[in-house]
UniProtKB/Swiss-Prot annotation:
Attaches the virus to host cellular receptor, inducing endocytosis of the virion. In the endosome, the acidic pH induces conformational changes in the glycoprotein trimer, which trigger fusion between virus and cell membrane. There is convincing in vitro evidence that the muscular form of the nicotinic acetylcholine receptor (nAChR), the neuronal cell adhesion molecule (NCAM), and the p75 neurotrophin receptor (p75NTR) bind glycoprotein and thereby facilitate rabies virus entry into cells. The gene is G. This is Glycoprotein. Keywords: Glycoprotein, Lipoprotein, Membrane, Palmitate, Signal, Transmembrane, Transmembrane helix, Viral envelope protein, Virion. It is found in: Virion membrane. Homotrimer. Interacts with matrix protein. Glycans are attached at residue 338. It comes from Irkut virus. Residues 504-524 are annotated as: Disordered. Residues 481-524 are intravirion. Arg-352 is highly involved in rabies virus pathogenicity. Its mutation dramatically attenuates the virus. Primary surface antigen capable of inducing and reacting with virus-neutralizing antibodies. Almost all human and veterinary vaccines are based on the functional aspects of the G protein.
Length: 524
C-alpha cells in the first residue's frame, strides 16, 4: 500500500473501531458487473465530493484546533489562605511585657481573595502590611489578646484543564480534581481546608485559546449535510461522527480523530468518554498538505497508466489497482473476467485491519460476503496466490507499517490529570509549615520594662519614685529610732535615792549618803 493510500485511508473513514487506523479501502457495496471497453476506463478524482451524491458545495467558516496546539491546557491561578495571627501579651508588676504569638486559620471568601490578589499583583503596600504580625496591646497586670486576619496569596499556581469538559486537575485538589466544578463555582477547594484555588481570570473560557477560524465548503444533498471540504482541500465525511464539546464549544469528532465546529440537524450521539481527538500540530498539518499533493500525483500516475493501456491496447490485473477509490465514498471497481474488462458501481469503506477483509484463507470479504474470484482474480488488482492466499498489492508496501506507526504517534490524548493519591498537598498538622514560609516569625517575645507611658513621663515617674523612696527611707529610720527610745525601762524611787551623788568634805564625789556614812565611820 502506498504512503498516499495509508494517509488517505486515515483521513477519510466511515466506520469506527477504537484504537486502530484505516489502512485500506474496499467496496462494501459492489455490482453488478458489466463489460466495458478500455476506452471507458476512468481514474477516480479523490478530491471531488462523491460521498452519497453530496455534490452541492457551499462556502462556510468553521472552527478547528489551532496548529501547534499542545495537549494540556495550562490555567494560571493562585491560592488564597486565610490566616489569623493572635498576639497575647501579659504585663507583670514591674512592667515586663511578655508577647506570645499564635496562628490559626479561617476559610476566606472569594471577593476578599481577589482583592488581595489585585493588591499583590499591583504592588500595593497594603498587601505586605496585611501580612505583618499585629501590634500587641498591653495593660499593667493584665493579659491582652490582639488578633489580625491576613490573606496569604501564592502565585502563580498552574493547573491543567481538560479541554473536553473544562475540568481542572492538580495534585493540590482533593483526589486530584477540582471540586466543586469550576463551571459551577468561582473557586476550587484544596487539600488544605482553609486554602482556595482561584483562576487569575474570572472567565475561564479565556484560557481556551486553542481554536482557529478556517474556511471550507459544506457538501450537502437535498439540504442534508454529508461532509465538508476543509481549508486544505480535503473532503471529510461526517459518517460515524459524534458530538463533542471542547472548552464549551459544540462540535463533532470525526472518525479520523479530528474535531470541527459543525452541527447537523440529525444530531449524532455524544462521544463516549474514551473518544479523544487528535492533536493538530505542525506535523499533522504537513501531512494534510502532503496528502493533497499526493492525491494529485496519484491521479497523474493513474492517467499515465490509462494512457499506457490505451496505447498498448492491453491491460493486466495489476494495473487495475491504480483505478481503486482511495477514500471512502462512491466510486467504481474493475476486474477481468474471461479476459474481458468488467466494471461495477461500488461504495468504498475503510478498514483498519487486514483480517476485516481476509477473515480466513482464500476469502476476500466484500459486500458482506466472501467475494467470488474468476480464475484467481478478484478486482482492483487483488488475486488469489498459488498457495490459496489472498494477495493485495498494497499489503506488500514497505511504507505502510512505517506510516501506520507515524499516525499512531500523532494520536495523543488531551487528558493529563495530575491526580496522585500519594501526594497530598498539606495535612492538617502541616498547615503551620505551609504558611510559616510566607509569614513573619511568631516566636515568643519579652520586652523591657514598659508601663505604657511616653518617654519623658517615664523618666519623670522614675525620678519621683526615687525621691519618694529616699524620703520614705528617712522617715522610716527616724521613726525606728524614736520607737527604740520609747521602749527603754524607767528606774524605781529607791534606785533613784541610791544613785544620788554627793560631794564629801575632802572634795571627792561620793555616790550616795550611805557610802559617805560608811567612809566617815571608817576613819580613825
Amino acid at each position: 500500500m502506498s504512503l498516499l493510500t495509508a494517509v488517505i485511508a486515515f483521513l477519510f473513514i466511515s466506520t469506527f473501531c477504537s484504537g486502530k487506523f484505516p489502512i485500506y479501502t474496499i467496496p462494501d457495496k459492489i455490482g453488478p458487473w458489466s463489460p466495458i471497453d478500455i476506452n471507458h476506463l476512468s481514474c477516480p478524482n479523490n478530491l471531488e465530493v462523491e460521498d452519497e451524491g453530496c455534490t452541492t458545495l457551499t462556502a462556510f467558516n468553521y472552527m478547528e484546533l489551532k496548529v501547534g496546539y499542545i495537549t494540556s491546557i495550562k490555567v494560571d491561578g493562585f491560592t488564597c489562605t486565610g490566616v489569623v495571627t493572635e498576639a497575647e501579651t501579659y504585663t507583670n508588676f514591674v512592667g515586663y511585657v511578655t508577647t506570645t504569638f499564635k496562628r490559626k486559620h479561617f476559610r476566606p471568601n472569594v471577593s476578599a481573595c481577589r482583592a488581595a490578589f489585585s493588591w499583590k499583583t499591583a504592588g500595593d503596600p497594603r498587601y505586605e502590611e496585611s501580612l505583618h504580625n499585629p501590634y500587641p496591646d498591653s495593660h499593667w497586670l493584665r493579659t491582652v489578646t490582639t488578633t489580625k486576619e491576613s490573606l496569604l496569596i501564592i502565585s502563580p499556581s498552574v493547573v491543567d484543564m481538560d479541554a473536553y469538559d473544562k475540568t481542572l486537575y492538580s495534585k493540590m485538589f482533593p483526589n486530584g480534581k477540582c471540586f466543586p466544578p469550576i463551571s459551577d463555582s468561582p473557586f476550587c477547594s484544596t487539600n488544605h481546608d482553609y486554602t482556595l484555588w482561584l483562576p487569575e481570570k474570572e472567565k475561564l473560557s479565556m484560557s481556551c485559546n486553542i481554536f482557529v477560524s478556517s474556511k471550507g465548503k459544506k457538501a450537502t444533498k437535498d439540504g442534508r449535510l454529508c461532509g465538508f471540504v476543509d481549508e486544505r482541500g480535503l473532503y471529510k465525511s461526517l459518517k460515524g461522527a459524534c458530538k463533542l464539546k471542547l472548552c464549551g464549544m459544540a462540535g463533532m469528532r470525526l472518525m479520523d480523530g479530528s474535531w470541527v465546529s459543525l452541527q447537523r440537524a440529525d444530531a449524532p450521539e455524544w462521544c463516549p468518554p474514551g473518544a479523544l481527538v487528535n492533536v493538530h500540530d505542525f506535523h499533522s498539518d504537513e501531512i494534510a498538505h502532503f496528502v493533497v499533493e499526493e492525491l494529485i500525483k496519484k491521479r497523474e500516475e493513474c492517467l499515465d497508466t490509462l494512457e499506457t493501456i490505451l496505447t498498448t491496447k492491453s491491460i493486466s490485473f495489476r494495473r487495475l489497482s491504480h483505478f481503486r477509490k482511495l477514500v471512502p465514498g462512491l466510486g467504481k471497481a474493475y476486474t477481468l473476467i474471461n479476459n474481458t474488462l468488467m466494471e461495477a458501481e461500488a461504495h468504498y469503506k475503510s478498514i483498519r485491519e487486514w483480517k476485516e477483509i481476509i477473515p480466513s484463507k482464500g476469502c476476500l470479504k466484500a459486500g458482506g460476503r466472501c467475494h467470488p474470484h474468476y480464475d484467481g482474480i478478484f478486482f482492483n488488482g487483488i488475486i488469489l496466490g498459488p498457495n490459496g492466499d489472498v494477495l493485495i498489492p498494497e499489503m506488500q508496501s514497505s511504507l505502510l507499517q512505517q506510516h501506520i506507526e507515524l499516525l499512531e504517534s500523532s494520536m495523543i490524548p488531551l487528558r493529563h490529570p495530575l491526580a496522585d493519591s500519594s501526594a497530598i498537598f498539606r495535612s492538617d498538622n502541616e498547615a503551620e509549615d505551609f504558611v510559616d514560609v510566607h509569614l513573619p516569625d511568631t516566636q515568643k517575645q519579652v520586652s523591657d520594662i514598659d508601663l505604657g507611658f511616653p518617654e519623658w513621663k517615664r523618666y519623670f515617674l522614675i525620678g519621683v519614685s526615687a525621691i519618694a523612696l529616699f524620703s520614705l527611707a528617712i522617715i522610716i529610720a527616724v521613726c525606728c529610732r524614736k520607737f527604740k527610745r520609747r521602749k527603754r525601762p524607767k528606774p524605781g524611787p529607791i534606785e533613784l535615792v541610791r544613785k544620788v551623788s554627793v560631794t564629801s568634805q575632802s572634795g571627792k564625789v561620793v555616790p550616795s549618803w550611805e557610802s559617805y556614812k560608811e567612809g566617815a565611820t571608817s576613819q580613825p
